A protein has these predicted regions:
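Conserved phosphate-binding loops in N-terminal lobes of ATP-dependent enzymes
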Residues: 1-15
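IMPase-like, lithium-sensitive Mg2+-dependent phosphomonoesterase catalytic core
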Residues: 5, 18-167
Length: 167
């Protein structure tokens, strides 16, 4: 269900949004690899506690994209991007967070459902992994994913058609 709070975009936060955000933050803040994080659910940069050590990467994420569709059983997922730290000092800064996409070290998403998939790239192709529940591990199921030269389908969100420019 809904919480009584809104995210930085003014969208009503779902309780599952907040749970996912806290889970990702708690899983990632103590690795020693990150200098900062930024989430759609927070207005400011999420600092890494000093007692965990700080690294040279920044994690940007939307903990539960599509959460407004939870009650109608449409797929939801987590979107993430990783940048290398560019500023001096130990703490991550706004300059570390607001880098262009071409500077990404890695990016990907996880889509949750009856089959949970992780898709990511580090700039050397896009690879898909499917969660094997019996092992509790993601197994490479879709190596070197690419767009077909001649696509069979085209999809657009007609719910936002009023925002399209004439063309």
């Amino acid at each position: 269900g809904s919480s009584d709070t809104a995210n930085v975009h003014g969208e009503r936060q779902q309780k599952l949004d907040l749970f996912a955000d806290e889970a990702i933050r708690k899983i990632c803040d103590h690795t020693g690899r990150l200098c900062a994080m930024a989430s759609e659910e927070h207005e400011d940069i999420i600092e890494i506690p000093a007692n965990f050590g700080r690294g040279k990467y920044v994690l940007l994420y939307d903990p539960l994209d599509g959460s407004s569709n939870i009650d109608v059983n449409v797929s939801v997922g987590t979107i993430f991007a990783i940048h290398r730290k560019v500023s001096g000092g130990e703490l991550g800064t706004i300059d570390d967070v607001l880098q262009p996409g071409r500077s990404l070290a890695a990016a990907g998403y996880v889509i949750y459902g009856s089959s949970t998939m992780l898709v990511y790239t580090t700039g050397q192709g896009v690879h898909g992994f499917t969660l094997d529940n019996s092992l509790g591990e993601f197994l490479l199921s879709h190596p070197d994913m690419t767009m077909p030269k001649t696509p069979v389908y085209y999809s657009a969100n007609h719910g936002r058609e009023k925002f399209w420019t004439p063309g």
